[in-house]
From Swiss-Prot:
This is Holo-[acyl-carrier-protein] synthase. Belongs to the P-Pant transferase superfamily. AcpS family. Coiled coil: none annotated. Transfers the 4'-phosphopantetheine moiety from coenzyme A to a Ser of acyl-carrier-protein. GO terms for cellular component: cytoplasm. The gene is acpS. Its cofactor is Mg(2+). It is found in: Cytoplasm. It catalyses: apo-[ACP] + CoA = holo-[ACP] + adenosine 3',5'-bisphosphate + H(+). The keyword Chaperone does not apply. It comes from Anaeromyxobacter dehalogenans (strain 2CP-C). Its EC number is 2.7.8.7.
Length: 128
């Protein structure tokens, strides 16, 4: 059973402007929004702005799927990359909201093309 659905689109140029701007501002943004593992993954890629944009879209989509819980922090939502498809780890307020909703599984898909990054998050319950 689908308990929540979130979709978000981010312009890669928006993230590129932040990364190319004043270093202190870029660092504050990255530290506030992305976990160390996310930063390491994105910074190791030539298209780092695209990778950051996709992860930012995933976090926005997750917040929408969770019903925009009060107090959720960007670092409560972490896009993980194993050997296969990306996944989304929830912590803190986001994890609490998911538990209250009865979420059994979080589905995440990311894509990027034509200067935009798109993410969709589906929250699935244990029911039929």
């Amino acid at each position: 059973m689908i308990l929540g659905l979130g979709l978000d689109v981010v312009e890669v140029a928006r993230i590129q402007r932040i990364l190319a701007g004043p270093p202190a501002r870029a660092e504050r943004f990255l530290a506030r929004v992305f976990a160390p593992a996310e930063r390491a993954y994105c910074d190791a890629r030539q298209d780092r702005a695209t990778r950051y944009a996709a992860r930012f879209a995933a976090k926005e989509a997750a917040v929408k799927a969770l019903g925009t819980p009060e107090g959720v922090r960007w670092l409560d939502l972490v896009v993980e990359r194993g050997t296969g498809a990306p996944s989304l780890a929830l912590d803190g307020v986001a994890a609490d909201a998911a538990r209250r909703m009865g979420v059994a599984r979080v589905h995440l898909t990311l894509t990027h093309d034509g200067g935009v990054a798109v993410a969709a998050v589906i929250l699935e319950g244990a029911g039929p």
